[in-house]
Amino acid sequence: MIEQIQGIKTDKNTNFYIDLKRLNPIKEELETFLKDEKEMKTLSFSKKVMQSQEVKTNNNIEGYFDNIEEIEEIIKNDSSIKDKEKRSRIINLYKGYKYILTKQEISKENLKTLYKVLSKDLLSKYDLDHMGPYYRDDDVFIYYSDNVQIPPDKGIQKQQIEEHMNNYFKFLNNQKEETMTDHYVKSQIAHFYFIYIHPYFDINGRTARTTSMWHLLKNEAYPYIIFNRGIGNTKNIYYKEILKAKQSNNLTSFINYLLKSVKQELEKEYIMQVIQSTQNKNLSTTEITTVLDILSMKGLRTLKDYTYLYNQKNEKKRIKDIKEEMLDPLLEKNIITKERETNGRYNHSGKNFVFSLNKDKLELDKNKVKMIKL
């Protein structure tokens, strides 16, 4: 049954809608999955994934392909790279995450502070000159595609921003939720509404997603902090769902997509924890990220296919380097196994090969792994 979302409206004063009954099955699956997951329900889990993985993914959604190793190096020593724009977008998110971990109230003043952190040294002169005390003071055009034939979208008119942002804060801070999954749904409705308003000229998407993370932290819905990872793996669907919700005022499909994508990421996290338990020492961030990417692969897993996936999400590397840096360490630790070589070669001396997760070493609860191919 479709019902009105209370507290938020369009710029034409019409309602947004959602079909909660349609969402109940996936919500129930998530609650069942999380029932026995003690580690994922801790603040330390959130802090761990926010350290570098979420920084990478939140920027990756916007089309930036920073390698996880480089992100960690910049976080440790922000003078280690000369590219000022790259350094700023990484350090800004890292500092923004530190800010929301303080659990301060999500308010107009605190959001202003967060936005200053996230946008530092990233805005154009025009953007800076046309910013009001809190929000943009001019129209903004939103391009979801490089195709010039597709007309840009627009944020709401500047004179309406204040009213809609006040509704946004009231909606987020009006606490009626009973479960962590309810808080996740609310955070993603707010995520959409923020993008719909588009209160700034730039950095709206990163701010929307970071503020949704803020709501999750504030309400101790810690497992869901990884939702950006799901978006990062399905960016085209993400932007299509935003446009569909804008055109129909119905958020059901958008929220259903985000519930399913975060369920996949939680399953991967469960598998990752089981893998970690088989090792004598903790895996590196690079190894963890590689395993998570492997779990995202559909169909046959080969060196060439993994290279293609890696180069879609990172600064490009040669297939030989990817084999040596990403896959060989996992082969040595018996986390993945080489099944067979293929007819193709990746250079004059190396053959492409099929690999798989070493399931013999994993004691997985099959009831918890329903969406991920092992």
Residues covered by each model-derived region:
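FIC/Doc superfamily catalytic core
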Residues: 1-201, 207-374
